[in-house]
Regions:
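Membrane-proximal helix-turn-helix segments that form the acceptor-binding/catalytic region
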Residues: 131-160
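Short hydrophobic beta-strand element within catalytic cores of glycosyltransferases
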Residues: 307-310
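Nucleotide-activated donor-binding/catalytic signature segment of Leloir-type glycosyltransferases, i.e.
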Residues: 251-273
Length: 390
């Protein structure tokens, strides 16, 4: 059914099953890039967890999200305002890629924030000290509900965005996607983080360590607990900060010895300026994840000039060069993390050199404008390809 288009602007629907304005990296990444895309002539609409019906429970809303997103796109088509591009998170895209013709034939871009298939295989390996293997219930339900949808979406989408080189290679080698149909997207940080770097003090005592991320096993929280337990015993003035946990402070503190609670600060959700200011209050940044895309929190930290200790995997090893702009350790190696932190504790010149190089690299490479230019090129290429094949 042909409809009369009422607008000449280029329209994109971003459909990701998280809340808008969420302090988590996924929402911030997508909103920041697409806000910047307005200067390229794009008009963005969002379909998020906030738009789902409150009834039915969390599991229902998760599985039904793809159908409600499809309905939103169909309604836009019927009123003469079809979307040119739909950016859909990989585990939620099956109904979108199946129903393109009923939505006006938009280009479909599958967005991965860390490939579901790769993390699933990591969990199945049972290689200590990696993440715990899935329960038998999860082994049955996850492939039958979410994992198949991720595979289907990635293979059927017109284009795929990913957040690290390992994922990009996996998509080409295992999913047999053409390299031209894969774009590596970078997270970025706003100017409030870069400007904070000018006020960092590398000469004060190094006794405050920060972990920023959701308080889940995949982020390496067991290693955070182990590392701080050791460091606090060796260094009486050592303090730990936790930012963006996504769970109540009481839940985080319950994972530590009660004797350490007075030395731990669990920050509430912070605005971007307040987050940049909070980062200035710490001396070392820990990112011990087993699996990620590329952590937005890592880029923000680097922008403020805080020396980082992170794992040599996923997007972390794409942006951190060991000994140049940060320190890399093997995933799960708590002892190596302790040694790296103590190396920084004992050497202010090393803290300064790594931190300043991190700030310089991040300010130069990881801006929202640069990220939007990459996304605009991919979107525009898809529209040109569609026009050429009409």
């Amino acid at each position: 059914m042909a409809m009369i288009r009422h607008s000449n602007s280029r329209r994109v629907l971003v459909a990701h099953n998280v809340s808008r304005g969420n302090s988590g990296g996924m929402a911030r990444l997508m909103e920041s890039i697409h806000t910047e895309l307005e200067s390229f002539g794009w008009k963005t609409e969002y379909f998020t967890a906030d738009d789902m019906p409150a009834s039915g429970g969390q599991r229902y809303r998760r599985y039904a999200f793809t159908w409600f997103a499809r309905r939103r796109a169909r309604e836009a088509f019927l009123r003469g305002e079809p979307f040119d591009v739909i950016n859909i998170h990989e585990p939620s895209g099956a109904a979108i890629v199946l129903g393109r013709s009923r939505m006006g034939g938009p280009a479909v871009v599958a967005m991965s924030h860390g490939l579901e298939q790769r993390y699933w295989e990591l969990r199945l390996r049972k290689d200590p000290p990696g993440p715990d293997p899935p329960t038998w219930k999860t082994r049955l339900l996850f492939p039958a509900t979410s994992l198949w949808q991720s595979r289907f979406t990635l293979r059927r989408a017109d284009h795929v965005f990913c957040l690290n080189e390992e994922d990009k290679s996996f998509l080409a080698d295992r999913f047999h996607l053409h390299p031209e149909n894969i774009t590596r997207v970078f997270p970025a940080a706003g100017p409030e983080f870069s400007s904070a770097a000018n006020r960092r003090n590398y000469d004060r005592p190094c006794n405050r360590v920060l972990f920023s991320g959701t308080w889940i096993e995949r982020k390496g929280i067991r290693q955070v607990i182990e590392v701080f337990s050791v460091l606090s015993g060796r260094h009486p003035s050592m303090r730990l900060g936790i930012l963006g946990a996504g769970v109540p402070a009481s839940s985080v503190l319950a994972d530590f010895s009660a004797s350490l609670h007075s030395r731990i600060t669990v920050h509430p959700p912070l605005s971007h300026p307040d987050c940049a200011e909070a980062l200035l209050g710490y001396d070392v940044f820990l990112s011990p994840s087993f699996f990620e895309g590329t952590p937005l929190a890592l880029i923000e930290a680097m922008c403020t000039g805080i020396p980082v200790v992170t794992t040599a995997t996923c997007g972390m090893k794409d942006v951190v060069e060991d000994g140049r702009n940060g320190l890399l350790v093997a995933p799960g190696n708590s002892g190596a993390i302790v040694r790296s932190v103590e190396l920084l504790i004992n050497d202010s010149s090393l803290r300064r050199r790594l931190g300043k190089q991190a700030a310089e690299d991040a300010a130069r490479k990881y801006t929202w404008r640069a990220a939007a230019e990459i996304v605009n090129a991919a979107y525009s290429g898809l529209l040109k390809s569609k026009a050429d094949h009409r």
